C-alpha cells in the first residue's frame, strides 16, 4: 500500500510539473523522491512532521524568490532561438521554434506532432 501511495505521489508531481512548465518532469520526480526519503528518515529519527513541512515550505519560498530574482526575460527572436536550441539540443530545431513563435506571437499556440515522413 505504501508503494502505491508513493507511485501516485510521483505520478502527480510529474503530471503537475508537465502541466505547469511543460518540462522538468525528471527533475521534479527526483526531487520528490529525495523529499519523501529524507522526510521519512527525519520523522523516523524523531523530527516533528509539521515542523518539517513548514521548513520545506519556507525552503520552497526562498528558492522560488531566488529563481524569480535571477530570471531573465527572453524577448528577441535570437534569444528564443538560443534558449530553444539548448532545450532541444539542436540549433536547427531552436531556429524552427523561434520562427514558429515569431509567427504566432506571445499568445499563440504551437503544436508539435510526430511524423512518419522521413526528413519532414
From Swiss-Prot:
GO biological process per UniProt: protein refolding
Reaction equation(s) it catalyzes: ATP + H2O + a folded polypeptide = ADP + phosphate + an unfolded polypeptide
InterPro entries found in the cross-reference section: Cpn60/GroEL (IPR001844), Cpn60/GroEL/TCP-1 (IPR002423), GROEL-like_equatorial_sf (IPR027413), TCP-1-like_intermed_sf (IPR027410)
Keywords from the UniProt entry: ATP-binding, Chaperone, Cytoplasm, Isomerase, Nucleotide-binding, Stress response
Molecular function, one GO term: ATP binding
Subcellular location: Cytoplasm
EC number: 5.6.1.7
Pfam families for this protein: Cpn60_TCP1
Keyword match Heme: no
Binding-site residues for ATP, renumbered to this chain: 23-27
SUPFAM superfamilies (alphabetical): GroEL equatorial domain-like (SSF48592)
GO cellular component terms listed in the entry, alphabetical order: cytoplasm
Membership in a protein family: Belongs to the chaperonin (HSP60) family.
Subunit structure of this chain's protein: Forms a cylinder of 14 subunits composed of two heptameric rings stacked back-to-back. Interacts with the co-chaperonin GroES.
Function, in words: Together with its co-chaperonin GroES, plays an essential role in assisting protein folding. The GroEL-GroES system forms a nano-cage that allows encapsulation of the non-native substrate proteins and provides a physical environment optimized to promote and accelerate protein folding.
Protein name: Chaperonin GroEL
Originating organism: Mycolicibacterium vaccae
Species lineage: Bacteria, Bacillati, Actinomycetota, Actinomycetes, Mycobacteriales
Gene designation per UniProt: groEL
Amino acid at each position: 500500500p505504501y508503494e502505491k501511495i508513493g507511485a501516485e505521489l510521483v505520478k502527480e508531481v510529474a503530471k503537475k510539473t508537465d502541466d505547469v512548465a511543460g518540462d522538468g518532469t525528471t527533475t521534479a520526480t527526483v526531487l520528490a523522491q529525495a523529499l519523501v526519503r529524507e522526510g521519512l528518515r527525519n520523522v523516523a529519527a524523531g523530527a516533528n512532521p509539521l515542523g518539517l513541512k513548514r521548513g520545506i515550505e519556507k525552503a520552497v519560498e526562498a528558492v522560488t524568490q531566488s529563481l524569480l530574482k535571477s530570471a531573465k526575460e527572453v524577448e528577441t527572436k535570437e534569444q528564443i532561438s538560443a534558449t530553444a536550441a539548448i532545450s532541444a539540443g539542436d540549433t536547427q530545431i531552436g531556429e524552427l521554434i523561434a520562427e514558429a513563435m515569431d509567427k504566432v506571437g506571445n499568445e499563440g499556440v504551437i503544436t508539435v506532432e510526430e511524423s512518419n515522413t522521413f526528413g519532414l
